Amino acid sequence: MRTQFRSVLGLLAGTVLCLAPQAVALPSTAPVAITAPREAAPAADPAYKVLVFSRTAGFRHSSIDEGITALRDLGAANNFTVDATEDPQTFTTTNLAEYRAVVFLSTTGDVLDNTQQTAFEQYLGSGGGYVGIHAAADTEYDWPFYEGLAGALFQSHPAIQPATVKIEDRAHDSTAHLGRTWQRTDEWYNYRTNPRSTAHVLASLDESSYSGGTMSGDHPIAWCKNYAGARAFYTGGGHTEESYADTAFRRHLLGGIRWAAGVTQADCRAETGYTSLFDGTNTTGWKQAGPGGFTLADGTLTSQGGLGMLWYNAREFTGDYSLKLDWKAGGDDNSGVFVGFPASDDPWSAVNNGYEIQIDATDTVDRTTGAVYGFQSADIPARDAALNPPGSWNTYEIRVTGERLEIFLNGRKINDFTNTDPVRSLKQGHIGLQNHGDGDQVAFRNIRIKQAGNEPPGPRSGAVRGVNGKCLDIDNAGTADGTKIQIWTCNNSGAQHWTIGTDNTLKALGKCLDISEGANTDGTKVQLWTCNNTGAQKWTAQADGTLRNPQSGKCLDASGSTWNDGTPVHLWTCHTGPNQKWTLP
């Protein structure tokens, strides 16, 4: 928020919206007409290259040629170059390094030999992108790494027929152009496993809308995930030749490619256990405080007027929780998300008794996007790397654990704040969305919450990624006390699978990340050791991306300055250089 309102500049001439009372959260004043939100002209994507691989060792889809043509057309219109091949010899580390993403276009069967598989794994571990289309799930059944990359493998399919696709995530670039449902005709795969527990589901099939679905009503059909250092996107559509002439499906593919290539950002962590607070159909449970309000159209709340706040009065939240929501600003618009405030019809109560997680492109650093407004700036480099530009959707996760407030933008932590003011305690309170003032129009969708009650949050497991995209690794997967800890190309092995405990330990292979002899001098070895609950085994994540050992006051550091496979980690004075930045699961 700001206490000084900006003048309105450059508003698009828009149609007048008719505000139906049941569809709008407004104060008890007469409805007002508003102009359509302005959106900045999108900037051109940076130039990059995409490899399209369509080798088939099994069934060959007649739509492959149409798919290649469509992808070339998308590239020509969106500043990427497509190289299409069926030659597996292309899969060398040198060749693959030219590409921001590799598309498996209805590949089938065993298409890469062991050497080529290794090269592809190395490419992905270095931050490459993968896009799987349709029969990419009918590929490489004997390569476990690939099954993890694709997310799920083909089981069966019924006849080609129309079906209703439910769009679960309308913020991702591959689905943001779609409505809440999408009517399509295609060949609908059933999968051997459900990817929901390991991937972020973007769209799923309504099995009641067609015949032959075998996934018990939970049938993901498009998803994304971060996997072994890579970005992986898969869509089950694309069997038919007609698919590649369908504007909506082509835009779906474009969004998947742009995300896999790192052009756009999204929260692609697996998501389960959330309860909807706003599902796009009505504002039941919400109440407007102060002037202005929100319009409701296309499953989206858009702020207008102000200064006011739409708050969830149906329930006060206590204990630990994770709040997620999607938001979009058209330009330099101002809004925010409030947490931890008492029930009140005065929007200033939230300002004075809670915390606002800011949405605003320009202001002082403690009052711009990702900041705890007026209290703590976001990690600006992390924020800027995670932020989609005006006119695009972004996703916040606001995680409350006791008095700790963590903010994630598109899946990346950008702020870590601890409250010390009893008046603003985060242990109980409501949540709200700010409508800041005339000219500030920010849209919100898909507001959901996952509560842990008063229980501590559970442990989190996965890779710990550091400098040069490499993973924290146990040398040769050894389990002896004193085994070296190093960085290594991410490989999804048990030697790189760490569990962050609620006791601030990092465990792998049944033992703990440990500072040798509990020392505190620069260069002290960090090793694997039997867990013993000492201060030498405690690590806390900082907002700047470092992992700090509270006992020594020093940070986990990849030694030296070249950071290749096998570089050991050690203890060192915190300096926030790239070799001290770690991304936790």
Task: Kindly label every feature range from the protein language model.
Residues 155, 269-455:
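Carbohydrate-interacting regions of secretory-pathway proteins
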Residues 31-37, 44-48, 62, 73, ...:
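Extracellular ligand-binding/catalytic regions of CAZymes and related secreted enzymes
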Residues 152, 156-229:
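Catalytic beta-strand/loop cores that center a nucleophilic Ser/Cys/Thr
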Residues 335-345, 483-489, 524-530, 568-573:
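Aromatic-rich beta-strand patches that line glycan-recognition/binding surfaces
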Residues 104, 109-178:
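A glycine-rich, often tryptophan-bearing local segment used as a flexible ligand/cofactor-contacting loop or short
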Residues 1-30:
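Secretory targeting and sorting signals
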Residues 455-479, 494-521, 535-563, 581-585:
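Extracellular glycan-recognition/adhesion modules and their associated mucin-like linkers
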Residues 51-55, 59-138:
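Helical hinge/lid and interdomain linker segments adjacent to catalytic or ligand-binding clefts
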